[in-house]
Amino acid sequence: MPPFAHRAGLVTEAERSQTRDALSEGGAFEARPWGGFRTLEEGSGYKVKRLVVEPGHRLSLQRHRFRAEHWVVIAGSPRVIVGGRARRLKPKATVTVPRGAWHRIENPGKVPVVIIEVQHGPYLGEDDIIRRQDDYGRTSERTERG
């Protein structure tokens, strides 16, 4: 597929499906309203995930008390917000999200965004999320461990 195809509206549903199929390797896929993720590996103090953000969707504006994250864009062109700074990224771009920083991943494009996320910290549970804003009604004053 030419690199401009998604911007020109030339991406077919079959091509989108092939992209999702190519990403289906690894552990169990955990669906979320925005797409979902697979945990690829985890150990003491770290976890590696493959995130897929579907076109037109975005994650919560959120932060974590116990972990920092490092993102590598694999596919798509996400808009990310970290610490109040928004920017558009391309494949191979990297982002560091410090512990406690408000952050979000958005997919304004026509193809799925794929990001490899490396989490590190003393606690990596899915309940270490404090949401400020969420498109899917999951906003809460305080959803955190401890």
Where are these predicted regions, by residue range?
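A short glycine-rich, His/Asp/Glu-containing loop-to-beta-strand
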Residues: E25-A68
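Short acidic-glycine-tyrosine-enriched beta hairpin
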Residues: G84-W102
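Double-stranded beta-helix
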Residues: P2-A31, R104, P108-G146
